Amino acid sequence: GNTEKQLAMLLDMQATVLIGTASYGLLLAEEAKKRGIADQLKLRKAIFGSERWGEKMRTRMEQILGLESYDIYGLTEIYGPGIGIDCDLHCGIHYFPEYIYCEIIDPQTGEILPPGELGELVITTLTKEGMPLLRYRTRDLTYLDPEPCKCGLPYPLMGRILGRSDDTVKIKGVNVYPGQVEDVIRMTPGLSSEYQMIIDREDGKDSVLIRVEEDPERHNPRAAWEFKHNIKAIINIIADVEVTPYQTLPRSEKKSKRVYDRRNLD
């Protein structure tokens, strides 16, 4: 926290590596640009974890701060600071099979899924003492990549975390993960990384409003229409869409809240 102090320390200490949440990294980047000090920072690398973050957020932070960012994955219950991280190709998370055994299951049935299929990550620790974990359900949604990474590292790959099974919202019978919305944002020109999804229910009918910020570097007058069309085609829900000016949605020094489910489901 304390953005003013963090920016001062980055300048005074000429730090070359930044570690934190991606939400806070974006906040620091935007504040540095706003104050005209982004080009004075010496950052070269960043490691972000503790939350799901997408490619548009990665691109935005890297453009402003002139660094390369890495996605680290970990759980308090297993090891610290992380149990996997992406490589220079940024095509997934390399994990360490000598320490953990990973499986993917159907979060509803518990059935083990084959490599490449999306499901809930289950981890068994192989060397942990004191509190070993057997088939621990992480609630994190990903898949195991059956192919070796082209970077040449011997460590297997899992996909970047799409979301959590307990963050899933059901809208008109369709399970929706926040990561799916971020993927649609990524493929829609003219949109930035920040969004909110607001779900209401009136007279027994669900409604969805998605607010997403415009990309300050790329104007697309059809962005709202294209995003709405892509949401319907890919996620199979109908949503109202508002494209808001850049930096109008709230920023966070911790984890950003994306989904607001205001339905009374009792």
Task: Give names to the regions the model predicted.
Residues 1-266:
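Active-site glycine/GP-rich loop and adjacent strand/helix microenvironment
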